[in-house]
């Protein structure tokens, strides 16, 4: 099982880089931006959604990423 640039290896034989995007926000982009920071007071969020134990939020084509960038199950249908 490989982990290439945040993609779990879920190709044939559980290898390659065509599987789940474990870290989709980690990409390098060079640009100039202006940021505005807004501080304020809002309502307290008491519910953070429901998620089963051991379930990963990242999934692609039936291929779910588990811990250590391993796919569970290793069966991508691309």
Swiss-Prot record:
InterPro entries reported in the protein's UniProt record: Metalthion_15p
Domain of life of the native organism: Eukaryota
Record bears the keyword Metal-binding: yes
The entry's keywords: Metal-binding, Metal-thiolate cluster
One GO molecular-function entry: metal ion binding
Role played: Metallothioneins have a high content of cysteine residues that bind various heavy metals.
Family affiliation: Belongs to the metallothionein superfamily. Type 15 family.
PANTHER family: METALLOTHIONEIN-LIKE PROTEIN 2A, METALLOTHIONEIN-LIKE PROTEIN 2B
Protein name: Metallothionein-like protein type 2
Organism listed in the record: Nicotiana glutinosa
């Amino acid at each position: 099982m490989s982990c290439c640039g945040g993609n779990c290896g879920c190709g044939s034989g559980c290898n390659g880089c065509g599987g789940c995007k474990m870290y989709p926000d980690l990409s390098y982009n060079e640009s100039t931006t202006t940021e505005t920071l807004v501080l304020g007071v809002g309502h307290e969020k008491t519910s953070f959604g429901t998620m089963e134990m051991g379930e990963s939020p990242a999934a692609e084509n039936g291929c779910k990423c588990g811990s250590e960038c391993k796919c569970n199950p290793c069966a991508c249908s691309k």
